[in-house]
Amino acid sequence: MTLVNYLVLSGLLFTIGAATVLVRRNAIIMFMGVELMLNASNLAFVAFGRLHGTLTGEVVAFFVMVVAAAEVVVGLAIIVSIYRARRSVSVDELSLLKN
């Protein structure tokens, strides 16, 4: 595959993730959309790194994965605590964090 193919795939994955975040109201599904966008950016970083023949893209993608893992831990903990309090993870019904 060429660089253009990887970038088109990355753009497609990012678009699907962004559409998921914008359209869905379930916090878990929105969370998966954000993770899809992060993985799409990782694919672009690695593709550009391979184009230039350096490990910079892989290193950046690794750090993005580390930050994404921390995001998953914190995000799922927040979603679970909201579910325990409200018995729903719908974003429309949440006013728990207001005020």
Curated annotation (Swiss-Prot):
Subunit structure: NDH-1 is composed of 14 different subunits. Subunits NuoA, H, J, K, L, M, N constitute the membrane sector of the complex.
Keyword NADP among UniProt keywords: no
EC numbers for this chain: 7.1.1.-
Name of protein: NADH-quinone oxidoreductase subunit K
Record organism: Beutenbergia cavernae (strain ATCC BAA-8 / DSM 12333 / CCUG 43141 / JCM 11478 / NBRC 16432 / NCIMB 13614 / HKI 0122)
GO cellular component terms given for this protein: NADH dehydrogenase complex; plasma membrane
GO biological process: ATP synthesis coupled electron transport
Superkingdom: Bacteria
UniProt-annotated location(s): Cell membrane
Family annotation (InterPro entries): NADH_UbQ_OxRdtase_chain4L/K (IPR001133), NUOK/Mnh_C1-like (IPR039428)
Family per record: Belongs to the complex I subunit 4L family.
